[in-house]
Structures are given as C-alpha cells and as structure tokens.
C-alpha cells in the first residue's frame, strides 16, 4: 500500500454486489476508474489513521465506496415548479373560475326571482279580471234593480188607480152623471199641479183649465171634490158646488173615502 500503490487485499470492497464485476483482462485500469467515476459509485483519496496509532502507521491509500446520488422525480419537479411565479399565475387563473361560479349562481337566483315576479303579476291580473267582471255584474244588477223599482212603482200606481187613488181615476157609479169625476188626492206629491178634467169656472172641458187659473199644489189641500151641478143640463158643463181645502192637514199617505154629490 505504500508509495501510492493500490491495495486489493481488502476482499470485502471488491466482493460487494454494488461493485459489480471486475473489468476484463483486455480493459485497462484507467477505463475502469473512468467507468466508476461516471457511475453513481465514486472513488476518493483520503488520509486516515489505522490502529494502533502511531506516526509510522500513517499512510495514504485509495478506498472505494458508493456515492448515492438522489435524483428528483419528474412529479417532484412539477410540484416544485408549482411554487414558482408560474404556479402563482395558475392560482390566479383559478380565481376567475370562482367568480364565474358566483356570477352564475347570482344570475340563476335573479332569473328565479324574475320568474316568481312574473307569476305574481299573472296572478294579480287574473284577480283583477275577476274583480272587473264582478263590478260589471254589479252594475248590471243595479240597473236591473232600478228597472224593477220603476216597474214596481208603475204597478203600484195602476193598483192604486183600480182602488181610486190619485192620479188614476176610479170608475164612477151608475147613478152619477157621466160628466162628473171623482178624484182622491191622497197620493199627490208636493209641487204637483192638480187640474180638474171637467169644465171648471165656465171653461170648456176640452181646454182643461186649472183651479183658480193657476193650478193647485198637492200640499195646499186636504180633500178636493169635483162635483157636477145637478141643476145643469146634460150639455157637459159643470161647476164646483163644494171645494174643501185645508192647509193644516198635509198627510200624503193612506186612502181617503171619496164622495160624489
């Protein structure tokens, strides 16, 4: 081992499976060492002290040992590259995806709200149409009620005429002259003018003069009797023999007995 010679007496070094096979006889040692240096196994020269200690035992020799070289995997390289600025850029690109998702959800929510509002508008329109129809039906019913009221008033007047109520005339009895009329002013309203249908105060019956030439208000009398003058001939002329007016009694309801003389 001295003088820089190689000591191959250590069989453990060369018998190791990691050393591989010895070089063939036609291969030089230089090529062998180059192969070792190019391989993961490496050779180095260092100085160490062997037991027992002493200056005469200090020597230098070359030993062979395995250098383990850890190569990063491709996936590890990708992971490491993800931490660079490019990875930050990729993370920045992912943020718009989240924003898009939020925008999409907001739009869907807005569309759902708009759809619900449209449904509410349609429902309110239907209710409005129903209310309009009800109002139209109510107006029709009110018109029908008014028509029936008018018909009732007309029928009541006709019934009152049959029993002798004013303004309808009850047919006269057989013993009363034909030119005489019997009137009952019970249903005469205020401010209604009453006309005697026969000749009054020397006026022809065709002209239809009013009492006192001005007409008589229904509120100014209690009982008015138009009676024929029995002393007159049957020429159709007649006069009042008795006119009884009373302002104190102004009753408008109830039937009063009519008298004819």
Swiss-Prot record:
Induction: Induced by zinc deficiency.
PROSITE patterns: BZIP
Region feature Disordered, mapped onto this chain: 1-22, 74-100, 237-261
Location(s), subcellular: Nucleus
Pfam families reported for this sequence: bZIP_2
Effect of loss of the gene: No visible phenotype under normal growth conditions. Mutant seedlings grown under normal conditions accumulate reduced levels of zinc in roots. Mutant seedlings grown in zinc-depleted medium have reduced root length.
InterPro entries (UniProt xref): bZIP, bZIP_sf, C/EBP
Primary location: nucleus
Low complexity bias spans: 237-248
Highest taxon of the lineage: Eukaryota
GO BP of this protein: DNA-templated transcription; response to zinc ion
Composition skew (Basic residues), residue ranges: 249-261
CDD domains: bZIP
Composition skew (Polar residues), residue ranges: 8-18
Ranges where the record places region Leucine-zipper: 117-131
Biased composition (Basic and acidic residues): 88-100
Region (Basic motif), start-end ranges: 90-113
Domain named bZIP: residues: 89-155
A single GO cellular-component term on record: nucleus
A molecular function GO annotation: DNA binding
Name under which the protein is recorded: Basic leucine zipper 19
Gene symbol of the encoding locus: BZIP19
